[in-house]
A protein has these predicted regions:
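Core catalytic lobe of class I
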Residues: 1-121
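S-adenosyl-L-methionine
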Residues: 125-157
Length: 157
């Protein structure tokens, strides 16, 4: 799928978690694979040293009631900062809980994200507003129209 989408697969990094993820498997997972690559016709950039490891040790979020696969913001900020500069555009076609959006906000990147599940769209917007401290200037797009967040939600900010 990576190749069919026009991407070059450079490698697979491993997110090593501080605790097991309990499931039905005989062996319990304590890691998650993260594919790393770039558009085949695109330019590959690297903005850090050559001592970076494929093993990434970041603690799981302490709570993830908002989304079943919530990622810690530092986990996403790490590869974003390694492979982009400030004001670069980052595209996240699976918005989830908004961790990529928040990582981009914290590292001065521009993030375009999409999420199909409406309840997770609400999670993304609320987490983002908590991060920036206000809903001022926050817009959402629904059915092709753009709305100020205050117009579509009951927010005290």
């Amino acid at each position: 799928a990576f190749d069919a989408a026009g991407f070059y697969l450079s490698g697979c990094c491993i997110w090593k978690k501080q605790s097991l993820v309990l499931g039905r498997s005989p062996y319990q997972w304590q890691h998650e694979p993260c594919l790393y690559g770039w558009k085949k016709k695109g330019k590959h950039q690297w903005y850090t040293g050559r001592k970076e490891s494929t093993i990434w040790e970041f603690d799981k979020p302490k709570k993830n009631g908002d989304h079943p696969t919530m990622k810690p913001i530092p986990l996403l900020a790490y590869p974003i900062q390694n492979s982009s500069m400030a004001n670069s555009v980052v595209i996240d076609p699976f918005g989830g809980s908004g961790s990529t959006l928040i990582a981009c906000e914290q590292s001065d990147r521009i993030c375009y994200t999409i999420e199909l599940d409406e309840k997770f769209c609400d999670v993304i917007v609320k987490r983002y507003i908590e991060q920036v401290g206000s809903s001022e200037g926050v817009t959402v797009q629904r059915d092709g129209a753009t709305f100020r967040f205050k117009e579509v939600a009951n927010v005290d900010n």
